[in-house]
């Protein structure tokens, strides 16, 4: 069972995607309203949740979730913390190790300024072990192209299981080089300045 609180369009999309593959408890907050952390903690205390998944930066309503506080709650109840960081990675501080996030999903086309059509998932060892355990139990979800096990095995050799979209990979690589030259802090400050300008 996965707990997915939402307060905007993209969080709701995340919840809908999760519903295709697992059991979900979807808590819908009013769009633009921050999550009630006390309510989330009560849910985790009462339920048998394996994970809590959030859309970190909800661009449809301009709300950034307090990922550090949510991560702390997840750790308290031994629940995996998963982050949709598509519009936060590259544009604001994201600390997967500090937050003990099991997975962070990111898209090239947002704050890393890469081409659309390519994404990445940063995962920790616990996530890998969980995937392997679920696979051994005979998981029936369709996953051929998105199977992380062959991707991880090939990744050890700097390869991919199938032909990647080379033009997108090279485009994102160039964008990441630009981010490295600009520095994370300068990019975060630039994004914050632009956000303030349009509010």
Regions found by a protein language model. Name each.
Residues 10-12, 33, 88-90, 110-114, ...:
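Short gly/pro/ser/thr-enriched loop/turn and capping motifs at secondary-structure boundaries
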Residues 89-99:
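Glycine-rich, charge-decorated loop segments at or immediately adjacent to ligand/cofactor-binding or catalytic sites
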């Amino acid at each position: 069972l996965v707990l997915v609180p939402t307060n905007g369009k993209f969080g709701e999309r995340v919840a809908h995607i999760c519903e295709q593959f697992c059991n979900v408890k979807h808590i819908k907050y009013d769009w633009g309203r921050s999550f009630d952390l006390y309510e989330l903690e009560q849910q985790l205390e009462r339920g048998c949740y394996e994970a809590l998944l959030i859309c970190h930066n909800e661009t449809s309503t301009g709300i950034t979730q307090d990922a550090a506080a949510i991560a702390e709650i997840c750790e308290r109840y031994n629940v995996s913390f998963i982050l949709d960081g598509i519009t936060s990675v590259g544009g604001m501080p994201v600390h997967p190790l500090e937050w003990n996030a099991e997975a962070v999903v990111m898209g090239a086309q947002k704050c890393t300024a890469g081409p659309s059509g390519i994404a990445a998932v940063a995962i920790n060892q616990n996530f890998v072990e969980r995937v392997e355990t679920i696979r051994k139990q005979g998981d029936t979800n369709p996953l051929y192209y998105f199977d992380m096990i062959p991707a991880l095995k090939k990744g050890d050799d700097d390869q991919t299981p199938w032909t990647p979209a080379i033009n997108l990979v090279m485009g994102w690589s160039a964008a990441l080089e630009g981010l490295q030259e600009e520095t994370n802090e300068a990019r975060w400050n630039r994004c914050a300045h632009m956000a303030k300008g349009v509010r």
